[in-house]
Amino acid sequence: AAGVDMAMKPDDSGVLESAKMADCEISACAVSAADAIREALDKAQRPVIMLGHGVSDKAVRDQLFTLARQWKIPVITSVLEMSALPWDDPLNFGCIGGAYGHRYANMIANAKSDLLICLGISLCTRQIGTKVHEFAKNAKIIRVDIDKYNLQRNIHESGNNEMKFCADAAEVIRALAENAESAESDGSTVYDFSEWLAVCADIKKSLRAVDDSTPERYPNRMIADLTDALADTSAVAVDVGQH
């Protein structure tokens, strides 16, 4: 990670001004991002952690997952991070993607959540669709990314209800973990979104990853059967695209 990063500066109303970025030390950016996430969690009822390949260190991911388990927050990943959590992990709600993502992931992130905590994930059009401003219209979005150019584009129209921090996501996660330890030691707020996690589990159960309800869906059933037949150590090579 770079030694110095830049964070988007919110105006007095708390809405981020996407055209303005200020120099700051990475640790300061990380603390600012962690504080913003905690403040947003204080008000949220349906938060989701959106995890991308920008958080590729296993130790850092495990630190994040420890927090997610403590706070009962569902995790949705990019396609590159699909293996970050075991498939049957109670926190795992699949990968985002309009065409190739899981239906329950798209439903939870796009239509049901009120807070998206986006860590090292680009939110490109392959992930959220070409109608960018329609994505998660009712949710506050907090984006942490090391790529300042990726943060120059808004997800919400005019950047409303959206905060951006150009920082190392690993530093932000560590800052969150330290913040959580301090909160527990002094008896401050400890989050519990277990009711929301249960709602997400119901959505996942209803919108199965494999839809074999009609004969036209047989290819889905075939792939599922093939998966069941393969050993856990099997390697499968596939081409790209909507195959």
Give the ranges of each region predicted by the language model.
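Glycine-rich phosphate/diphosphate-binding loops that line cofactor/substrate pockets in enzymes
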Residues: 33-48, 67, 108-112, 225-232
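Phosphate/pyrophosphate-binding active-site segments
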Residues: 1-3, 16, 35, 39, ...
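Short beta-strand elements at the ligand-binding edges of bilobed clamshell
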Residues: 22-28, 87-100, 156-170
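Conserved beta-strand elements of the Class I
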Residues: 48, 114-117, 237
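Short, well-ordered alpha-helix to beta-strand connector turns
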Residues: 44, 113, 138-139, 160-161, ...
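A general structural motif
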Residues: 23-36, 96-101, 217, 240-242
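Structural signature of the thiamine diphosphate
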Residues: 1-15, 39-40, 105-142, 179, ...
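Glycine-rich, anion-gripping cofactor-binding loops and their flanking helix/strand elements
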Residues: 53-142, 146
